């Protein structure tokens, strides 16, 4: 009994020393502010995922002070103003800091999650690190947020022709989406991530676009009601990216962070697939093969236009082109080679 008591005392002593050592180590590390956009707040998946990231970052040489924002524009403004050393944003917001990785969200450029996984793996490779840095900024991780689908208040809006003249909620800073709206002849209604769902749900717009993870928290089912639906067509691959002021972090922090993000890709994908699966089947609207082919070509033309206008980075478009053609080498775009 005495021996057990001695062992317990020794164990507790060792445990307290470990915690003390950990505490001292954390105190010695530089504290860096990390601003995270999560529309749901502290209970949202982006912020919750960053709690594990924060623990991992201690080994990379930084103690992170996490701040969550439910308004992405405010998070972006604070980062630009220097109030944040790093920030987590949606891919569309990344363009001022890295046009190369912002082009991941190019419309129709990634066919499925396997291509997305391969891309994130390629970009997490140390050989790709030079593309992750532009000026003072470094992309420190890319995580999937899911395929972007079109939500409609009436299933009769199941074609480009049917969408002509309809009011489409359009993220006002998303140049690609604005061009798509013009292509289909819809009426653009400017919105933000904070306002697109309320406008869709109250009938102010006829269509909106979002990944499946938006369905439940944004209550998109209210806007669809009994007549609405979701077109099963991958408009783009939404993603989240972490941006650092690289001079505020240790030299290898960004690389280790990118590797961490890729390692956790399956976990993020599981959350996305679950969200898609949990949407009632009655809402999904399948397009004919002819429509699918027609709309993919329309998006390809939009990509080429945006590349020529300097919005999309041709280097990223070339990588995405190669991923698509490896998966489907007989496709006519692989012969035409307009993005290769």
Language-model region placement:
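A beta-strand-loop signature enriched in Asp, Gly, Thr, and Trp
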Residues: 217-232, 242-244
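Bacterial N-terminal signal peptides
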Residues: 10-20
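Bilobed "Venus flytrap"/periplasmic-binding protein-like clamshell domains
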Residues: 28-60, 138-202, 206
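Contiguous mixed-secondary-structure segments that line small-molecule binding/active-site clefts
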Residues: 90-184, 234-339
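Sec/Tat signal peptide C-region and signal peptidase I cleavage site
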Residues: 22-26
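Bacterial N-terminal signal peptides that target proteins for export
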Residues: 2-11
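Short, glycine-/small- and polar/acidic-enriched structural segments
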Residues: 28-148, 213, 222, 230-236
């Amino acid at each position: 009994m005495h021996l057990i008591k001695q062992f317990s005392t020794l164990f507790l002593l060792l445990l307290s020393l470990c915690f003390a050592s950990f505490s001292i180590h954390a105190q010695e590390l530089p504290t860096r502010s990390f601003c995270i956009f999560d529309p749901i707040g502290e209970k949202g998946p982006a912020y919750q995922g960053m709690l594990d990231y924060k623990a991992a970052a201690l080994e990379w040489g930084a103690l992170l002070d996490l701040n969550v924002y439910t308004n992405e524009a405010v998070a972006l403004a604070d980062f630009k103003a220097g109030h944040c050393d790093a920030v987590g944003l949606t891919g569309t917001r990344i363009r001022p800091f890295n046009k190369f990785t912002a082009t991941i969200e190019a419309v129709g450029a990634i066919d499925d999650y396997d291509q997305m996984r391969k891309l994130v793996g390629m970009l997490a490779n140390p050989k790709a690190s030079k593309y992750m840095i532009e000026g003072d900024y470094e992309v420190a991780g890319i995580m999937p947020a899911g395929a972007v689908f079109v939500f409609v208040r009436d299933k009769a809006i199941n074609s480009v022709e049917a969408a002509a003249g309809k009011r489409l909620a359009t993220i006002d800073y998303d140049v690609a989406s604005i061009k798509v709206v013009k292509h289909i002849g819809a009426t653009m209604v400017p919105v933000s991530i904070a306002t697109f769902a309320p406008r869709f749900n109250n009938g102010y717009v006829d269509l909106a676009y979002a990944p499946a993870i938006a369905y439940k928290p944004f209550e998109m089912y209210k806007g669809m009601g009994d007549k609405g639906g979701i077109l099963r067509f991958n408009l783009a691959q939404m993603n989240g990216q972490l941006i650092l002021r690289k001079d505020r972090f240790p030299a290898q922090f960004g690389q280790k962070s990118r590797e961490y993000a890729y390692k956790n890709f399956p976990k993020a994908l599981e959350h996305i697939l679950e969200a898609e699966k949990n949407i009632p089947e009655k809402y999904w609207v399948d397009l004919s093969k002819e429509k699918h082919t027609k709309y993919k070509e329309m998006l390809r033309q939009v990509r080429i236009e945006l590349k020529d206008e300097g919005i999309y980075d041709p280097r990223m478009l070339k990588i995405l082109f190669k991923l698509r053609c490896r998966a489907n080498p007989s496709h006519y775009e692989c012969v035409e080679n307009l993005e290769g």
